């Protein structure tokens, strides 16, 4: 089959497999690529190609991740699979592989296990919006009642973490039998693909979201005023539009009187572009790196939040010793460091390098944030942890 060219016409959706070790996540990933390639075209990927995951670096953290892609008639999917449990934790917290939806793999022979629960909880904390369940190894369970029991347990577990357990699609299948080409089990993979197409809504592209530009630099240009530069994170900014300057100090409003890129004037700056924005009547000293320009009312500044954090191990260049409550590192948001103090969950005295932990953070300055914002934890300029805002407190 000749190599197909990448079609930009189909909506692009990011998904991934999650679930307990040895429940069949990688086998399922291989089965999806194989069955969909057979029915709809595209490349099949063998189990060992996926299992042998390359190392990647995200925010200074080493993660083993496999990326595969596949197509259904209506969509193009990018799918991420991780070999080890620690890789999942890091992946989800750093947002290295943002997921529009996840496929939770549960072996019907075991039912939900500790990591099943942990991955669902992590999914809730880091903002995975949709979960579809693949009940695997159903070819090894003859008892219909047992399957129903496992299904019920999974639904209860999802509901416990605020996912709609009763309405979640659950597919009963066998990844291994589908991979081996057994028709009745291949059907189950097509059923799963159909749920991906219908249950996970098309993600909103960055360009369609409200405008946000993290400020990297501020210049004063004589006779013209103040220019801030940075990469537009989302949305579009047009000359003449009103924006808010949010974070660190009290929020203020101003008007963008010009947008430029490589010293050329533009009508607008779009998500992904590095631009300079000329601001009306704003003094150089009123703005600093670490603030954001945003569509008015779209984002607010906060100091206190709950977060899910992964603490780098010594081997990853992290701390060599644990830390305790009252620890005061820097929290790096977008373009700047802000000092903050931490509170640990009840009953947790200390946090070891390599742990993942839920912690409450209180910053000394407010930062423009919403749920799902990623940050790094730093000490003297080196990264010692990565986290995500799970819930804003104030």
UniProtKB/Swiss-Prot annotation:
Its main location: cytoplasm. Pfam families: GTP_EFTU, GTP_EFTU_D2, GTP_EFTU_D3. This is Elongation factor Tu-A. Monomer. GO terms for cellular component: cytosol. The lineage of its organism: Bacteria, Pseudomonadati, Pseudomonadota, Gammaproteobacteria, Pasteurellales. GTP binds at residues 19-26, 81-85, 136-139. PANTHER family: ELONGATION FACTOR TU, MITOCHONDRIAL, ELONGATION FACTOR TU-RELATED. Mg(2+) binds at residue 26.
């Amino acid at each position: 089959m000749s190599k197909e060219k990448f079609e930009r016409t189909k909506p692009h959706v990011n998904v991934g497999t999650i679930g307990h070790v040895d429940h069949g996540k990688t086998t399922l990933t291989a089965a999806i690529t194989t069955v969909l390639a057979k029915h709809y075209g595209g490349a099949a990927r063998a189990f060992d190609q996926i299992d042998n995951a390359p190392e990647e670096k995200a925010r200074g953290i080493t993660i083993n991740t496999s990326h595969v892609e596949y197509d259904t008639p209506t969509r193009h999917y990018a799918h991420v699979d991780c070999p080890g449990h620690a890789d999942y934790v890091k992946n989800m917290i750093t947002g290295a592989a943002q997921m529009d939806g996840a496929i939770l793999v549960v072996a019907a022979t075991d039912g939900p296990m500790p990591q099943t629960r942990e991955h669902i909880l992590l999914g809730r904390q880091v903002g995975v919006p949709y979960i579809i369940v693949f009940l695997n190894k159903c070819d090894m369970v003859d008892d219909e009642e047992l399957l129903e029991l496992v299904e019920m347990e999974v639904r209860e577990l999802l509901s416990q973490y605020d996912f709609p357990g009763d309405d979640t699609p659950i597919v009963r299948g066998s990844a291994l039998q589908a991979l081996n080409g057994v028709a009745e089990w291949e059907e189950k993979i097509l059923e799963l693909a159909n749920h991906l197409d219908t249950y996970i809504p098309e993600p909103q592209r960055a360009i369609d979201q409200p405008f946000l530009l993290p400020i990297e630099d501020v210049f004063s240009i004589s006779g013209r005023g103040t220019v801030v530069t940075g990469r537009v994170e989302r949305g579009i900014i047009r000359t003449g539009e009103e924006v808010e300057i949010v974070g660190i100090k009290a929020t203020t409003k101003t008007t963008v009187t010009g947008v430029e890129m490589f010293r050329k004037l533009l009508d607008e700056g779009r998500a992904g572009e590095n631009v300079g924005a000329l601001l009306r009547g704003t003094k150089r000293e009123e703005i600093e790196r670490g603030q954001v320009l945003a569509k008015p009312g779209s984002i607010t500044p906060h100091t206190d939040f709950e977060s899910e954090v992964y603490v780098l191990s010594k081997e990853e260049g992290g701390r060599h010793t644990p830390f305790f409550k009252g620890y005061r590192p820097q929290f790096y948001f977008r373009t700047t460091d802000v000092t903050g103090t931490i509170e640990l969950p009840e009953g947790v005295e200390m946090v070891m390098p390599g742990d993942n932990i839920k912690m409450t953070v209180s910053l000394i300055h407010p930062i423009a944030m919403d749920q799902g914002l990623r940050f790094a934890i730093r000490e003297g300029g080196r990264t010692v942890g990565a986290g995500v805002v799970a819930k804003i407190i104030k």
